[in-house]
Amino acid sequence: YRLTYYTPDYQVAETDILAAFRMTPQPGVPAEECGAAVAAESSTGTWTTVWTDGLTQLDKYKGRCYDLEPVPGESNQYIAYVAYPIDLFEEGSVTNLLTSIVGNVFGFKALRSLRLEDLRIPPAYAKTFWGPPHGIQVERDKLNKYGRPLLGCTIKPKLGLSAKYYGRAVYECLRGGLDFTKDDENVNSQAFMRWRDRFLFCAEAIYKAQSETGEVKGHYLNATGGTVEEMYKRANYAAQIGVPIIMHDYITGGFTANTSLSMFCRDNGLLLHIHRAMHAVIDRQRNHGIHFRVLAKTLRMSGGDHLHSGTVVGKLEGEREVTLGFVDLMRDPYIEKDRSRGIYFTQDWCGMGGVMPVASGGIHVWHMPALTEIFGDDACLQFGGGTLGHPWGNAPGAVANRVASEACVQARNEGRDLSREGGDVIREACKWSPEL
C-alpha cells in the first residue's frame, strides 16, 4: 500500500474531501503503511493487485494519505490525513459518503484502533446538499421569537403515560412559558400510547396554550417509525393537524430516511428536531469510532433544524472547547481551523442554513447563567427534571425556567458578567417570582 497510497508531497486540491483519522497501528506495523492502508481501503484499493486496475486511472480516483503527525502524549498513535477525489462520491448522499470513508476500513487487521476525527467538505460537494429544512433564521421568523435562547422540556416519565395525561403535561409546560415540549426518543407508537392519539392530544395542548399565552408553541412529535412509509404517514398527519415541528432519531433511523424526511419538512413547512440516540455507541471511545463533530457535520448536510449537542456545564474545560467547536460547525457559515477546539480543517458551508444546537441532560435553573453565556441566543435549552421536578408542579417549573432565562438575557444585555454574577442574577430574579 505504501508505494501507491502514501504521498507526502501531494498538493491537496480545493475539491478534495479531507479526512483526519486517529490511528493506532499494531506493534511492528509502520505508521506510513497503516496510513496508506486506510487511504486504500476507503477508496480504490483491495488486498492484492488486480488486472482491472489497468482499465482505470488509479491516479485520478485513489485516496491519498498525504500527512502523518504523532499524537502528543501517546506512544504509538498518529493523525493520518487522507485526501479523497470528489468524483468518488455521489452528489447529495451522506449515506454514500460515510459508506465510502468509514464503511470498510475499521476492521482492518493492521490497525489496533481507528477513529475518524474530522472531515473537510469542500464547497463543490457541500453545494450538492440541501442542508436543514429551514435553518435558524427562518425558525425564528416562524416562531416570532428573537433575542433569547429557546426553552424546551422533555415529558417524563418517558414511557407509560396515556395520551391524555401526556397531553396534559405538555399543556402545563407550554402554558407556564416554555416554547417547546418534546417526545422522548423512544416514544414511537407503543401499546400504552399509539402515535395518532398522542399527536391529537399534544395538538390540543399546543392550541390551548397558544390561545392563552399569545405565543407560538410547539411539541416535537416523534415521527420515527419502523418503515419509511410509516414515518411519512406520521409526518403527513402532523402537517395536516397544523403543528409546527416534528422529530426524528437520525442515527437509528438512518441517513437516507433522515434526508427524505428533511425534504418532506421543507416542502410542508415543518421544522425538524433531530435526536442523536445511539451516538455514544459510535463516538464515546477516544481511540475508536467516529467523533461527534463528524456526525454533526453530516447531519447538517442531511438536514435538521435542531440537533442535541451536549450541555458543556459541569464538564472538563477542554471538553468545553471541543463542544463549542462542533456547536460552531452546526450553526456558523464559515469556521476556521482551530486544533485547540478539535477543528482539523477550515470549513466553508457556502450559505447552507444553520442547525440550532440543543443543550439537554441534567440542566436546571442554576445552570442558566452558564448556558446563556456559553451558547448565546441561537440555542434551545432542553430541560426535563429541571422543569417537571418543581415541587409545585409542571407549570410553575416552566415559569421558573422562563424567568431565569429572561433574567440572564437581560443581565447579559446590561453588560454584567454572567460567569461571575450568575448566581446573584438568579437570586435577584427570585424576589419577583415565587416559582423560581
Curated annotation (Swiss-Prot):
One MF term in the entry's GO annotations: ribulose-bisphosphate carboxylase activity
State the EC number(s): 4.1.1.39
Active site: residue positions = K156 (proton acceptor), H275 (proton acceptor)
**Which reaction(s) does the protein catalyse, per the Swiss-Prot or TrEMBL entry?**
2 (2R)-3-phosphoglycerate + 2 H(+) = D-ribulose 1,5-bisphosphate + CO2 + H2O; D-ribulose 1,5-bisphosphate + O2 = 2-phosphoglycolate + (2R)-3-phosphoglycerate + 2 H(+)
Question: An example Gene Ontology cellular component term from the record?
Answer: chloroplast
InterPro entries for this protein: RuBisCO, RuBisCo_large_chain_AS, RuBisCO_lsu_C, RuBisCO_lsu_C_sf, RuBisCO_lsu_fd_N, RuBisCO_lsu_N_sf, RuBisCO_lsuI
Which keywords appear in this protein's UniProt record, sorted alphabetically?
Answer: Calvin cycle, Carbon dioxide fixation, Chloroplast, Lyase, Magnesium, Metal-binding, Monooxygenase, Oxidoreductase, Photorespiration, Photosynthesis, Plastid
- Residues reported to bind Mg(2+): K182, D184, E185
- The record's free-text note on cofactor binding: Binds 1 Mg(2+) ion per subunit.
| Marked site positions, Transition state stabilizer | K315
Q: Where in the cell is it found?
A: Plastid, Chloroplast
Q: Where substrate is bound, by residue?
A: N104, T154, K158, R276, H308, S360
> Which residues does the record list as N6-carboxylysine (modified residue)?
K182
User: What are the names of the required cofactors?
Assistant: Mg(2+)
Record's PROSITE patterns? RUBISCO_LARGE
Q: NCBIfam families, alphabetically? A: PRK04208.1
- General remark: The basic functional RuBisCO is composed of a large chain homodimer in a 'head-to-tail' conformation. In form I RuBisCO this homodimer is arranged in a barrel-like tetramer with the small subunits forming a tetrameric 'cap' on each end of the 'barrel'.
Note the subunit structure: Heterohexadecamer of 8 large chains and 8 small chains.
Q: What does this protein do?
A: RuBisCO catalyzes two reactions: the carboxylation of D-ribulose 1,5-bisphosphate, the primary event in carbon dioxide fixation, as well as the oxidative fragmentation of the pentose substrate in the photorespiration process. Both reactions occur simultaneously and in competition at the same active site.
Protein name (Swiss-Prot/TrEMBL): Ribulose bisphosphate carboxylase large chain
In which organism is this protein found? Euglena viridis
